[in-house]
């Protein structure tokens, strides 16, 4: 069966970028169709990414904290885990949120069409679904088709013991020995979960540090902690993967490579994601897609075709849900006739590991590459009363300042709940705050959050929580 519908706006993809764009379009009075290949809204983030991983990381954190309390006189005994119940709870979290999105779409009168959409012309999109095809004739389109995990040709991805992030989040089993290929955020988060559930974790990373985008001093603190849990093989890469009856055998080369192939019960391939730009027949609409699958846009999220926009992972790095949401709002408002631009000063990044690693604005490496003269100020959590009382004193908060203006241009936090503490730094950069603005803002005590203010005091030379400050010249 085939049907044909008309819309002022069609949004292709219902992840955070897509549904946010569709809902904003509807709120602005535009007749909107939202196309989603899967049966639920929310995309990778809500269904097989951000949200389920945080549910499992919460479980992992509770397990680890229960064990750690034994050192302080509270002994719970060895945690007993019921994988089926954990999986059911994770699915309940997802269902609650996807159900909420479906309700909001209905309330806004956004028409949802399920199926795989492809362009057939500059104003037409055909969606192939289980119940036939739907042709959408549109005035404007927003492409929010997301990304997928990178696959390597020498890896037997058809073997059930070779996972991508989606497979890892299904929580079908807990392998005795798990290899995580890639020391980025996704791999480390999943390693954190499976270590807490009982797996032995090896992490192989080709660079000289995990989380390569973050500054070395921040990652050093993180690495010191996780080295007690994971076997880190840095400056090392996988050269061969062979599936045998008794396990997955992996050969490696590099600084930390074992001499012989290693047997694993499962291998998680977490080496990045590739955009879905080449899957949409966007060329039929005249939209240019580069060789990697990215779609280039301007600051109003327009592609080279003026009435077709693109947002989210498909337009480039960083591939983060919160970036896509803001891009979606911009695209919707531009279509509605408003003057709006995507021009953020900062986009925060967070690894929700334990400890968390979070940064926003420029890193030191980026400041150097841009030729910016800068200074840093660090407040160690070893001097934080709240951190000591909460048994997380190995963290640190770092601010990066323009040397001439003293304005904050970047910041990073490594420590428990670091991602929750990062917002002040991001806002400070957006608002053009200098060190004095932050230092003179009274922060509640005792909190981990006050470490941001104390780092600013370190820069100003006014801190009394550390010895021998050197006052800044005004």
List PLM regions with ranges.
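A Rossmann-like FAD-binding core segment of flavoenzymes
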Residues: 111-114, 118-129, 136, 198-299, ...
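Short hydrophobic core segments
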Residues: 10-12, 117, 136-146, 181, ...
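Glycine-rich flavin
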Residues: 2-7, 17, 23-174, 207-211, ...
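Conserved phosphate-binding and hydrolysis motifs of nucleotide-dependent enzymes
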Residues: 13-18, 146, 182-187, 272, ...
């Amino acid at each position: 069966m085939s049907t044909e519908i008309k819309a002022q706006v069609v949004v292709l993809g219902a992840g955070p970028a897509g549904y946010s764009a569709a809902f904003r379009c509807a709120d602005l009075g535009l007749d909107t169709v939202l196309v989603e290949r899967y049966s639920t809204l929310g995309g990778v983030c809500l269904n097989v990414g951000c949200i389920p991983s945080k549910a499992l990381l919460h479980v992992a954190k509770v397990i680890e904290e229960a064990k750690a309390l034994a050192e302080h006189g509270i002994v719970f005994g060895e945690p007993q885990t019921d994988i089926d119940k954990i999986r059911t709870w994770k699915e309940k979290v997802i269902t609650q949120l996807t159900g909420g999105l479906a309700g909001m779409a209905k309330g806004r009168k956004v028409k949802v069409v399920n199926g795989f959409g492809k362009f057939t012309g500059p104003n037409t999109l055909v969606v192939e679904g289980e119940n036939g095809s739907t042709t959408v004739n549109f005035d404007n389109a927003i492409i929010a088709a997301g990304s997928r995990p990178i696959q390597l040709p020498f890896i037997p991805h058809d073997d059930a013991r070779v996972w991508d992030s989606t497979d890892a989040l299904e929580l079908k089993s807990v392998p005795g020995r798990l290899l995580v290929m890639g020391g980025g955020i996704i791999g480390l988060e999943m390693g954190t979960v499976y270590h807490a559930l009982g797996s032995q974790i090896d992490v192989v990373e080709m660079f000289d540090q995990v989380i390569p985008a973050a500054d070395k001093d921040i990652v050093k603190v993180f690495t010191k902690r996780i080295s007690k849990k994971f076997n880190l093989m840095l400056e090392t890469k996988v050269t061969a993967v062979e599936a045998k009856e008794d396990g997955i055998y992996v050969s490696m080369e590099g600084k930390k490579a074992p001499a012989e192939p290693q047997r694993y019960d499962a291998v998680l391939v977490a080496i990045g994601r590739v955009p879905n730009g080449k899957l949409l027949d966007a060329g039929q609409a005249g939209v240019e897609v580069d060789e990697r699958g990215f779609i280039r846009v301007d600051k109003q999220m327009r592609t080279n075709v003026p009435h077709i926009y693109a947002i989210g992972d498909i337009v480039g790095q960083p591939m983060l849900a919160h970036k896509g949401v803001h891009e979606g709002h911009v695209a919707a408002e531009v279509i509605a006739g408003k003057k709006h631009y995507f021009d953020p000063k900062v986009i925060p990044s967070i690894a929700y590991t334990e400890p968390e690693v979070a940064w926003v604005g420029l890193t030191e490496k980026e400041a150097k590459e841009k030729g910016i003269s800068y200074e840093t100020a660090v407040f160690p959590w070893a001097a934080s009363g709240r951190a000591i009382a909460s048994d997380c004193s190995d963290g640190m908060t770092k601010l990066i300042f323009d040397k001439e203006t003293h304005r904050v241009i970047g910041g990073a936090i490594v420590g428990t709940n670091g991602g929750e503490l990062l917002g002040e730094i991001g806002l400070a950069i957006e608002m053009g705050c200098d060190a004095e603005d932050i230092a003179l803002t009274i922060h509640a005590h005792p909190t981990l959050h006050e470490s941001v203010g104390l780092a600013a005091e370190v820069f100003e030379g006014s801190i009394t929580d550390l010895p021998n400050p050197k006052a800044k010249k005004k």
